[in-house]
A protein has these predicted regions:
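Interdomain "pre-motor" coupling segment immediately N-terminal to P-loop NTPase/helicase cores
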Residues: 1-27
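Conserved helicase motor core of SF1/SF2 NTP-dependent helicases
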Residues: 35-163, 167-257
Length: 257
């Protein structure tokens, strides 16, 4: 097994947090091999909890800062389920409005409008499957990428469904999405409540879901922290520096509702 820089960074971080005894557990299971034959494994304890949760629950929420691998792991688990014949298709979606910019103001057809906001999803698919195979599966509609609004009225059976950037859903959008769950399907809902781009008077569907769904047996919530950041170590420090402000904003918003 080749040990890379991210592995060393993870080990050092776990030593600092007195968790080094759990380091070996991260390498016990290979999820899948990527397009180059390199094994994909979890890199932090938070990621391990996330992967285990997806295996054990129908719906898993992954909540935490950027750089924790939420999107990449979700796509990895979806492709793994597809390759094993556990599902027949993968559906990836997200809210279509970001930072006050409506898709209606972007040129081109639907795919061109959505694609700029889905680069992390495409990057993950290309790394795991390769660009050619990803394109073929999309042409056969085995992999579908679409705005959240296009999920309305559908029942998603035999599917692995991923909602990314869920912090930017409204309460009704979140309810609409979750009620699409069909038989023999799994859902992953990822989001970062410190990066909500909704108007200040609109409550995030992700925050609302945490409050309403926490006691449903087959739904689980996994919370990532700066310790789970798998990018450059400075990124984790930046996230920690910014953590207090978003929390206070969210608390203030909830108090006024």
């Amino acid at each position: 097994m080749t040990v890379g820089t991210p592995d060393v960074v993870t080990a050092i971080s776990m030593v600092k947090n007195d968790e080094i005894d759990k380091f070996v557990a991260l390498y016990e299971e290979e999820i899948i091999k990527d397009n180059t034959g390199k094994p994909i494994r979890v890199k932090t304890l938070g990621q391990k909890l996330y992967v285990d949760s997806v295996k054990q629950h129908d719906v898993t929420f992954g909540i935490g800062p950027a750089g924790t691998g939420k999107t990449f792991l979700a796509v990895t688990l979806a492709v793994t389920a597809l390759k094993r014949g556990q599902v027949k298709r993968i559906i990836l979606t997200r809210p279509a409005v970001e930072a006050g910019e409506s898709l209606g103001f972007l040129p081109g057809d639907l795919k061109e409008k959505v694609d700029p906001y889905l680069r992390p999803v495409y990057d993950a698919l290309y790394q795991i499957l390769g660009k050619d195979q990803t394109t073929r599966l999309m042409e056969r509609e085995i992999i579908e990428i679409a705005p959240l609004a296009y999920m309305r009225g559908r029942t998603l059976d035999d599917a692995f469904v991923i909602l990314d950037e869920a912090q930017n859903t409204t309460i009704m959008q979140m309810k609409m999405f979750l009620t699409r769950l069909g038989f023999n399907s799994k859902m992953i809902v990822n989001g970062d409540i410190s990066q909500i781009d909704l108007p200040r008077n609109v409550k995030s569907g992700l925050i609302d879901a945490q409050e309403k769904l926490k006691n449903i047996h087959q739904i689980d919530f996994v919370h990532f922290s700066a310790k789970d950041v798998v990018r450059h170590p400075v990124v984790a420090q930046i996230i920690r520096a910014y953590e207090p402000a978003p929390v206070k904003v969210e608390e203030k918003k909830q108090e006024t509702e």
